[in-house]
Amino acid sequence: MTVKVPPLKCQGIKTKLANWIKDHSTYENNGTWIEPFMGSGVVGFNIAPRRAIFADINPHIINFYNAIKNRKITAGSAKEFLEHEGALLQKHGEDHYYEVRKRFNKEFDPFDMLFLNRACFNGVMRFNKKGFFNVPFGHKPERFAKAYITKITNQVKYVSQATSQYDWNFVCSDFHQVISSASQGDFIYCDPPYIGRHVDYYNSWGEQEEQELYELLKTTPAKFILSTWHSNKYRTNSAIEKYTYHFTILTREHFYHVGANEKNRNPMLEAIVLNYNPLTPIDLQEEKQLSLLEKKQREEYLLYSTPSV
């Protein structure tokens, strides 16, 4: 199934994992779809829930999507803006990029956010200790070709249509409050920052936050999926052993292309943590019948399954 790509990119975006995550979701549009760590929003955008709360601690992400919801940003206005700024970028190169970055850090205009997100280095979304966007230029002055602008405006158009059709709310909030608001029948999708990776002003993340998140998820009446990483060739995620023994874990190998650090470009075994068993009795029987060789050849496999609900 074709994945609907969001207009804002960010490191760790789950575009290539969205269908895999969606396939293991039991959300049936009866409750509210809740994302405490919206980021790009790609998973929720592909679920297309009737009711959703997309939350993030980064106000610039929330302001951008509220600008689409409130029709400040439309496909037409985004096209016009990117054509204008793209022409200036092609003419003046990095000087124009840094001029827009300076302007954004003063005015925080969501149009500038879109431009910077698509013109910066590798689509990284990073803010310094003062809360200012500080990603360098991506060194592609010809970035905003006609086809590329059309691609972005179509992405804006999808979100605009979805916010007209569905009850989607974009809120700037801490994950504690968002998860605590969930009720039975709701579905939570969590994509928190990874410890030690992509840390900045808005997404610093450590052991304490990781523990608090899992404690909240252990007690929520809602079903959830949490995206995390399991291991790479250097190390294993210690949180998997510490906090997930109550839950089901599925894994899949994935390769991230975002990040300047070569160490962060290695293949990684991604994991999703669930508080339910997504496999049917038939699936479980087939799982038992797989040979060891077949298991190794499978793209995803069940590590262990002891769901709490």
Report the location of each language-model feature:
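Conserved S-adenosyl-L-methionine
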Residues: A18, H24-G86
